[in-house]
Regions:
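Composition- and surface-driven signal marking solvent-exposed, interaction-prone regions
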Residues: 153-155, 196-197, 246-249, 272-280
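A short, flexible helix-boundary coil/loop motif
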Residues: 238, 242-243, 268-285
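Helix-centered, glycine/charged polyanion-binding patches within enzymatic domains
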Residues: 178-250
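Polybasic low-complexity intrinsically disordered regions
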Residues: 1-181, 185-187, 194
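Amphipathic alpha-helical/coiled-coil segments positioned at domain termini
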Residues: 252-253, 257
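A glycine-rich phosphate-binding loop feature that marks nucleotide/adenosyl-phosphate handling sites
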Residues: 39-40, 185-192, 250, 278-285
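Hydrophobic transmembrane alpha-helical segments of multi-pass transport and channel proteins
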Residues: 264-265
């Protein structure tokens, strides 16, 4: 998962951001508001802080409801007082977007988690320290020998892993100039055994008809697949894939390509300096 540079999303944060944006919009257009609700929002923010406390949960829910009401009041006021030509041409789409964010409920699908990055989606990881991540799903493919990255794809939808395979294999074919015969994946990709001309191999129990050589070969290949995990870890920690600061889906693709290019360039530089060292050593000898 390539996480986006957004704060942890909550309904209260989104409502407060919408209210602040509407107040700035009114000030920019020179509209005199009946109320800006700035002082009330400070108190409501304090009430929402204790949402997890059993005795203060109802108070927090009321505070969230009040924040949404304030945002709707400001939207209606701006619709009345803004010039009609400016409203319908420039700001109507923006107001509809805010209303959609305010109408979101707990179990809704395709929710908006950020006002400046609306394409971000939630990915459930199931880890103890971080159960959910907010960004976009990424596929990385490397060679069996050399750990050179030959295919990277940024997905704009939260697809099942098996549904991401065709796009990744297509990108590998473009990069290498030839199709892959065998792709070794983890168990998250179960569901497909063949994609076009590529055989998908997953770690599973050996077949009865397999001889010892075939069993050992499959076991070694599946163990070799685990080498992609530290590569992804290095891309996140050393090559800025852990947090994406570029905007939009195009920014996701650019950041991923730059990280993969940096990884391959680093491997090429290491190989080049080793060759230079050996040549110099031979010359001195």
């Amino acid at each position: 998962v390539q996480e986006k540079n957004i704060t942890y999303p909550t309904d209260a944060k989104l409502a407060i951001k919408i209210i602040n944006r509407l107040n700035k919009l009114a000030k920019f257009h020179g509209i005199s508001q009946r109320r800006t609700f700035v002082k009330e929002i400070k108190n409501l923010r304090l009430s929402i802080r204790h949402f997890r406390h059993v005795k203060k949960r109802s108070k927090a829910r009321k505070a969230l409801k009040r924040l949404r009401t304030i945002a709707h009041i400001l939207i209606r006021e701006l619709r009345r007082k803004l010039p009609q030509t400016c409203l319908f041409e420039c700001l109507q789409e923006q107001f509809l977007f805010y209303e959609r964010v305010l109408a979101q409920q707990l179990r809704d699908k395709n929710k908006i988690y950020s006002l400046h990055e609306p394409q971000v989606y939630c990915i459930a990881k199931g880890k103890d320290h971080k159960q959910y991540e907010y960004g976009n799903k990424v596929s990385v493919a490397s060679t069996a020998k050399g750990n050179i990255i030959v295919g990277v794809v940024s997905h704009d939808k939260n697809l099942h892993d098996s549904h991401t395979l065709p796009e990744v294999l297509r990108h590998i074919e473009v990069t290498r100039g030839s199709a892959v015969k065998t792709a070794i994946c983890d168990r998250g990709y179960r569901g497909k055994s063949q994609v076009n001309e590529t055989t998908i191999q997953l770690p599973k129990k050996p077949l009865k008809r397999d001889n010892r050589y075939q069993r050992d070969k499959k076991r070694k290949q599946c163990r070799r697949r685990a080498a992609i995990e530290p590569i992804i870890g290095h891309l996140k920690s050393d090559f800025r894939l852990s947090r994406n600061f570029l905007k939009g889906t195009l920014g996701d693709e650019i950041n991923l390509l730059m990280a993969a290019t940096a990884w391959n360039l680093r491997k090429w530089l290491i190989a080049f300096f080793w060759w230079l060292f050996l040549v110099r050593k031979e010359a001195l000898d």
